[in-house]
Curated annotation (Swiss-Prot):
The gene is ATG5. It is found in: Preautophagosomal structure membrane. Its main location: membrane. It holds the Pfam family ATG5_HBR. GO terms for biological process: aggrephagy; autophagosome assembly; cellular response to nitrogen starvation; mitophagy; piecemeal microautophagy of the nucleus; protein transport. This is Autophagy protein 5. It is a peripheral membrane protein. There is a cross-link at residue 168 (Glycyl lysine isopeptide (Lys-Gly) (interchain with G-Cter in ATG12)). It comes from Cryptococcus neoformans var. neoformans serotype D (strain JEC21 / ATCC MYA-565) (Filobasidiella neoformans). Conjugated to ATG12; which is essential for autophagy.
Amino acid sequence: MASPNPAQSTTILFRRLTWQSAVTISIRLADGEPGAGNACDRYYIKAPRYSYLPLFIPEIRENLVELALDDAQLEQIDEKNWWFEEEVSEEDKQRFVRQGACRWHWPIDLVDIHSFISRPQPLPSSIELSSTPRVISLLLHLSNPPQDRLLMPNSIEVCKSQWLNQVKEADFVRWRNTNRVTNLRRVDLEAGWDGIVNNDFDLYAQMVNKIVPLPLLTSSNSTQPSRPSSADPSGPPRAPDSSYATRAIPFKIYLPDNAPVIQEIVPPISESGKPTTLLAVLQVHLPLLFPISSENPYELAFPIAQGILIPQEAEVAWIASCLCGVDGWVRVGVCLSAA
């Protein structure tokens, strides 16, 4: 029996820990909606970071809306018109622009990123962002959805389609093709989404272990991607893909004040032949916030991903293997440091 690959075992451990990360969300019926202001107008959920808001609509309807509204009011509402936005306090209104309406295809982690970076925060003293659990406060609207902001309906099938599109796009960024996704057996591809819906990591891993490469750094690693996996199941076994050998890392940087998302080519290996670190990426694309000359690179701002502070020496290839979202993308939020 072949001995287990230490890199694979460690990667699976970190992927499972990332999978288990969750966000506490407080959901309140928006002012002016039927049932708002009564004793049953708020509901709390513990939402996995990898999940999506449309998956929680049945639970929210049963445990919030059906308790807050009477039968006549329930007959007048349509779930297709529901939408969420982050609740903003009077103090926060004086700060950066908030995320507003939450898009249906955003993973919960991205909703949390936008919420966290919307105001300057003190630099965490450890990898924990806060000593007390954070709660995202969302308002539930039952009508008049802002279609120009939401972009798509809250259908689970539409959400699944958008997730799959992101999976393919991430694969293309890595290898300049989508062969690893398109060559998957249908049962493995469906297992990825079913794992998300059913909160089953092992089911999800049935897909992700076949398309997201391991952080294998060897002397043979280069910036040139390896050949795509063969579609012939009878072919000879192929060495595991390395995230250090990909063309680029599926990588997005989110900024406060609803600034445009930064999505550039991020190679796993720098021109000097050394692994690309997160700090190096930030210094290239945000030099004013992360100046090269600074003794404390996180003095003005700091990066977060999956709810934790990311160390400056973290290699982006490792992050892409162990801390990426369920669609394969690394999402880093940049938060300004509080004075």
